[in-house]
Amino acid sequence: MKMETFLVCLFHNADGLHQQIQEILYLLRMHIYETNLYLKQELSRLIYPNRQLSFVLLMPLSLLRNWDDIEYLTDVVDDKQTLHYAANLLTNYVLHLSMFQKLTKPYFLLAVKRVSEKLNKKQQHSFYEVLVTSETLNNYENLSKNILNTLMFAVRYVFKPTPNYSEILAELEKKNKIHHIIFNMVITDFAQIREQQMDKHLCETNNKLRQECKETIFDLKVVGNV
């Protein structure tokens, strides 16, 4: 299952958003080829009409400057500016995955607004640091960081695959179901970059997991409890 399919599943008002999400993901796939400015302009054009998408996908790049976990990808992308921007997008996918199921509740929308205001005022701080200053969002502290690590690892794996894919998959599945799903969605989606070089076993494994992921997604009442 591709990531855009998962995002559409999480949107209760998903009509008309599918093409937008596909375009956004295309831009994300191209982040190693294009400039940060181009990406930002294109994303602004795509996302501006939808405030929810704007919040989760257009955080200031500077907020991630001090996030140590970004260094995990430094051996994949050489350009630091591009690296930070890609990590910024990945971070916001994580936020979307972990928070959207409660975004329709007024009290949570208020918390999101407050965090957004803090992000605009405290650009010298890391995004993670600002996020956990909100009492309402404290329950998501570990979830966001752990899922981000999984997401980053998955993208890193796409560019520099290792032979022990099955072992990694089994370990993720044993530890946390949502990590298992995310890893496979990212692998399936981003692997288009190196489609001709994809390992046969990797393709077969992803095909088998699609139905499993689809069934599990609709069982996730609250992502934080998975």
Curated annotation (Swiss-Prot):
<dbReference type="GO" id="GO:0085034">
    <property type="term" value="P:symbiont-mediated suppression of host NF-kappaB cascade"/>
</dbReference>
<keyword id="KW-0945">Host-virus interaction</keyword>
<feature type="signal peptide">
    <location>
        <begin position="1"/>
        <end position="16"/>
    </location>
</feature>
<comment type="function">
    <text>Plays a role in the inhibition of host NF-kappa-B and IRF3 signaling pathways. Mechanistically, promotes the degradation of host IKBKG through enhancing its ubiquitination leading to inhibition of both pathways.</text>
</comment>
<keyword id="KW-1100">Inhibition of host NF-kappa-B by virus</keyword>
<comment type="similarity">
    <text>Belongs to the asfivirus I226R family.</text>
</comment>
<keyword id="KW-0732">Signal</keyword>
<feature type="glycosylation site" description="N-linked (GlcNAc...) asparagine; by host">
    <location>
        <position position="142"/>
    </location>
</feature>
<protein>
    <recommendedName>
        <fullName>Late protein I226R</fullName>
    </recommendedName>
</protein>
<keyword id="KW-0325">Glycoprotein</keyword>
<feature type="glycosylation site" description="N-linked (GlcNAc...) asparagine; by host">
    <location>
        <position position="164"/>
    </location>
</feature>
